[in-house]
Amino acid sequence: TTVAATKLTSLKATAGKLGYREICQVRQWAPLKSAMPHFGMLRCATSTVVKAQAQAQATATEQTTEEAVPKVESPVVVVTGASRGIGKAIALSLGKAGCKVLVNYARSAKEAEEVSKQIEEYGGEAITFGGDVSKEADVDSMMKTAVDKWGTIDVVVNNAGITRDTLLIRMKKSQWDEVIDLNLTGVFLCTQAATKIMMKKRKGRIINIASVVGLIGNIGQANYAAAKAGVIGFSKTAAREGASRNINVNVVCPGFIASDMTAKLGEDMEKKILGTIPLGRYGQPEYVAGLVEFLALSPASSYITGHTFSIHGGFAI
């Protein structure tokens, strides 16, 4: 018997003598351990409560974080002359990267639609716009189309261009004007229109496609060389003026890039051209597109502006 039981028996006997029947009817005390919860059960219950509280807190934290972090919108990009060649490669590269792309073209509507379709197959968004970038009304309409569709413009790649090659002494003024209007004035008009939009949100990137010919000249391309050299000088000024509004302007100068035109060159001509390139081969449109993507989207390029990048395999070292 326990000490508690002995005391209870003694108490009952004493109470009986004194006539306190109620006390005699008191039930036997239960052992102390049966009156207390098992520590193992207590631990389990406590653990369950703690886990539930932690889970609830984690869920609340996740919800708060989701609400606090703003949704990142896909950059809106306008690429001129994007239906083929370098422009096509740039549009596809930016589309793959998640951009919303306006694919500009002048005459190649079918090809532009194919580019747009490919971007959508990658999971991106794209629209096409037929317009002449040397005409102010077309440029304004193009920019408005992008803004109406997606709300803003983040990046512009001025790639549209033509050639009208002939020796200087034989060049007609119309050939000069046509190349200057599209290759230089077109860059001016698109950059001006885009800058007005970008200034409002104090952010934007403009990449102008020039040429190695604008750096070193080339026989039979006085008009083209003048236009591309003009693009380089123009871009440096635009970079200085846009810097206070966080608008970066840079230039890419391709050399000999594989195209439908190079594919039609004879073996002898190709051998001569490749002999002038230290790397001994043509560049690919995707090489240019990769550089443009870096300048357009990478945080690492945010401190680069007013710079001219050559991508020519060493041709103009």
Curated annotation (Swiss-Prot):
Spans through the membrane: none
Catalytic residue list: Y224
EC identifiers of the protein: 1.1.1.100
One BP term from GO: fatty acid biosynthetic process
Pathways involved: Lipid metabolism; fatty acid biosynthesis
Transit peptide: 1-57
Catalyses which reaction(s): a (3R)-hydroxyacyl-[ACP] + NADP(+) = a 3-oxoacyl-[ACP] + NADPH + H(+)
Top-tier EC class: oxidoreductase
CDD domains: BKR_SDR_c
Residues binding substrate: S211
Keywords, ordered alphabetically: Chloroplast, Fatty acid biosynthesis, Fatty acid metabolism, Lipid biosynthesis, Lipid metabolism, NADP, Oxidoreductase, Plastid, Transit peptide
Gene Ontology CC terms, in alphabetical order: chloroplast
Residues that hold NADP(+) according to the record: 79-103
Predominant localisation class: plastid
Cellular compartments annotated: Plastid, Chloroplast; Plastid
SMART domains attached to this UniProt entry: PKS_KR (SM00822)
GO MF: 3-oxoacyl-[acyl-carrier-protein] reductase (NADPH) activity; NAD binding
Complexes and interactors: Homotetramer.
Entry similarity comment: Belongs to the short-chain dehydrogenases/reductases (SDR) family.
Protein name: 3-oxoacyl-[acyl-carrier-protein] reductase 5, chloroplastic
UniProt organism field: Brassica napus
Gene expressing this chain: bkr1
